[in-house]
Amino acid sequence: MGRAFEFRKGRKMKRWSAMAKTFTRIGKDIVMAVKEGGPNPDANSRLRAVIQNAKAANMPKDNVERAIKNASNKDTANYKEILFEGYAPHGIAILIETASDNNNRTVANIRSYFNKCNGTMGTQGSVEFMFDHTCNFRIAKDGIDAEELELELIDFGAEEVFEDEDGILIYAPFGSFGALQKELENRGLEILSSGFERIPQITKELTEAQIADVEKLIEKIEEDDDVMNVYHTMKEE
């Protein structure tokens, strides 16, 4: 198995915050998708993907429909996606994806978390190159052979296809999302969820005490409502 498999296995044992936080993230994704491509999921592939993710997270249908309606209102503020980079203690690179309606607030908050936890906020491009930006899809098994599917999807950008207890996972470079989504839909395969992840190219092993130092910063960052995802180069068991 490749790095995507190991990455997924490691993160699975860790976080995904409380359900309320997950719903907040999906709500922001809906706003950004609607503002970008309109409220009709049939004509908006990004919104279609977010709705699939909402279903996978057991977000009530009424909540999704209400969020789409609110996002369609021109008075509803859009969110700007901002990427922050820096270092946690012990040389661990940190990459933070945010979606904010107030850039100044988000910058100040992220900077304060680094300062309070003995980290260092970096400049643009300081650690992003240490991560591979990927897209992923989870589809229903339905008797599908993962190895055969991988061979069939190589021309659409697929790099790694593997099975777990919840379905079949497909990983590809970030830029292959549209082509893969279209091909999976054309094949009539049920997409359970999809998204983007940044996979560290190299990870660093730490002692238990050092891990606690890094986790303190990560947890502080993840508590912020503007934060969507946090990635790092610390090795996870």
Curated annotation (Swiss-Prot):
A Pfam cross-reference name: Transcrip_reg
GO cellular component, one term: cytosol
Tagged with keyword DNA-binding: yes
Annotated NCBIfam families: PRK00110.1, PRK12378.1, YebC/PmpR family DNA-binding transcriptional regulator
SUPFAM superfamilies the record matches: YebC-like
UniProt record, GO biological process: regulation of DNA-templated transcription
Protein name: Probable transcriptional regulatory protein Fjoh_2560
Family: Belongs to the TACO1 family.
GO molecular function: DNA binding
Alphabetic keyword roster: Cytoplasm, DNA-binding, Transcription, Transcription regulation
Domain of life: Bacteria
Cellular localization per UniProt: Cytoplasm
